[in-house]
Amino acid sequence: MTEVKKGKINQILGPVVDVRFPSEWLPEINTALELNNHGSKLVLEVSQLVGDNIARCIAMDTTDGLVRGQEVINTEKPIMMPVGKQVLGRMFNVTGDPIDEQPAPTGKRMPIHRPAPSFAEQAEAIEILETGIKVVDLLVPFAKGGKIGLFGGAGVGKTVLMQELIHNIAKNHGGLSVFAGVGERTREGNDLYYEMAESDVLDKTALVFGQMNEPPGARMRVALSGLTMAEEFRDAFGQDVLLFIDNIFRFTQAGSEVSALLGRMPSAVGYQPTLAFEMGQLQERITSTKKGSITSVQAVYVPADDLTDPAPATTFSHLDAKVVLDRAIASLGLYPAISPLQSTSRLLDPLVVGVKHYSVARRVIEILQRFMELQDIIAILGMDELSEEDRQLVMRARKVRNYLSQPSHVAEKFSGQPGLSVKLEDTIEGFRKILDGECDDIHEQHFLYVGKIDDVFEKVAKSK
């Protein structure tokens, strides 16, 4: 029988705990340590070895009730997450303990820290993933096995858009999904769980939560816990996995809190000096290999609507598609409030999406760009001062802008309007008709919150 390697708590500073070990038993960085905190298991993760045989650790749960001199066990391995079929339909915390009042899984576990796949193992992602959301499919096509970021400030609809993508993709996708709730509202996680149960996708989904009320250690590691489950589905089962992370900014924020507690010098805007490294470690593991793919959708909170903030700016470089949500569009009551001019996708290329799709998308972007340039003239001088050509362009641009809106399935209970999914070919055809002037005699109001262009013609026929 192997000897249990024990240390003792030397100091407690909020979520940071110093543990002294005998020199021959000193744990490695990222090792999980365990102790009994008034009947419940508390996991610590080694972050620094500060000398004098002391391991400085981050707690994965509250440290209330800990005392100096308390015994701590070195598990000699990282935090281990349950993986495989046993996690489907279940809800876990950062350390792999169930939080759905069901028994703990007893099967295979994998460490949350591991290297990213090598270049030789990786596969390219160029297949289009249809979402049924017009503005996304037309202007910001998603790659199957790619990385997608939803950028937006507070209250512009990131979580609703993510839940809509879960509804549209996970339902039609047929594969397995993992949802990691990182530092967001517990209520939203609760709602998501019951919505998934109702729509019969829960048995193909694993959920991992480290929400707002958790200490920074849990919020910093829960994205890795969810990713570990997704990697197992990809590597061992050869699956095309969907990984949803809400919200990746909270991962950075937790890293910043931990960094300050560990006494590191802050860098730009008070973020941790290791920001790019930590983000890279996480993002490089979210990739497609020759065995299977991970398609990830990540919500990214943008502090004070500033896209140049180091946290969202660091995330940008890792993504295939960037969906930017705009407060100005949300204030017009147009949802999803996606900015067509700020959002970009690597896949919007005639060689990938085809010439017809590409040319319609470019024309939509051009007309909206010109419309934006004319806004100041319209505001000062009015529409009458525009040339006939520009006036026609503005009328079409307004129709295009309204037609980019769409009723969502997850907001059905608030809006009372049934959600709609639109096929890509119908989306392309609809915008082509508006741009070619086939809808010039229809008022722009009729284009709000409809699906296909045929729905607009039906609306007009009914109103006559």
From Swiss-Prot:
Pfam families, sorted: ATP-synt_ab (PF00006), ATP-synt_ab_N (PF02874), ATP-synt_VA_C (PF22919)
Localization per Swiss-Prot or TrEMBL: Cell membrane
GO MF, one example: proton-transporting ATP synthase activity, rotational mechanism
Keywords of this entry: ATP synthesis, ATP-binding, Cell membrane, CF(1), Hydrogen ion transport, Ion transport, Membrane, Nucleotide-binding, Translocase, Transport
Membrane topology value: Peripheral membrane protein
Top EC class for this record: translocase
GO CC entries: plasma membrane; proton-transporting ATP synthase complex
Assigned EC number: 7.1.2.2
Domain of life: Bacteria
SUPFAM superfamilies: C-terminal domain of alpha and beta subunits of F1 ATP synthase, N-terminal domain of alpha and beta subunits of F1 ATP synthase, P-loop containing nucleoside triphosphate hydrolases
Primary localisation category: membrane
Gene3D superfamilies associated with the record: 2.40.10.170, Bovine Mitochondrial F1-atpase, Atp Synthase Beta Chain, Chain D, domain 3, P-loop containing nucleotide triphosphate hydrolases
CDD domains for this protein: ATP-synt_F1_beta_C, ATP-synt_F1_beta_N, F1-ATPase_beta_CD
Residues binding ATP, per UniProt: 152-159
Enzymatic reactions: ATP + H2O + 4 H(+)(in) = ADP + phosphate + 5 H(+)(out)
Biological role stated in the UniProt entry: Produces ATP from ADP in the presence of a proton gradient across the membrane. The catalytic sites are hosted primarily by the beta subunits.
Family from the record: Belongs to the ATPase alpha/beta chains family.
Subunit comment: F-type ATPases have 2 components, CF(1) - the catalytic core - and CF(0) - the membrane proton channel. CF(1) has five subunits: alpha(3), beta(3), gamma(1), delta(1), epsilon(1). CF(0) has three main subunits: a(1), b(2) and c(9-12). The alpha and beta chains form an alternating ring which encloses part of the gamma chain. CF(1) is attached to CF(0) by a central stalk formed by the gamma and epsilon chains, while a peripheral stalk is formed by the delta and b chains.
Protein's name in the database: ATP synthase subunit beta
Organism of this sequence: Ureaplasma urealyticum serovar 10 (strain ATCC 33699 / Western)
Highest classification ranks of the organism: Bacteria, Bacillati, Mycoplasmatota, Mycoplasmoidales, Mycoplasmoidaceae
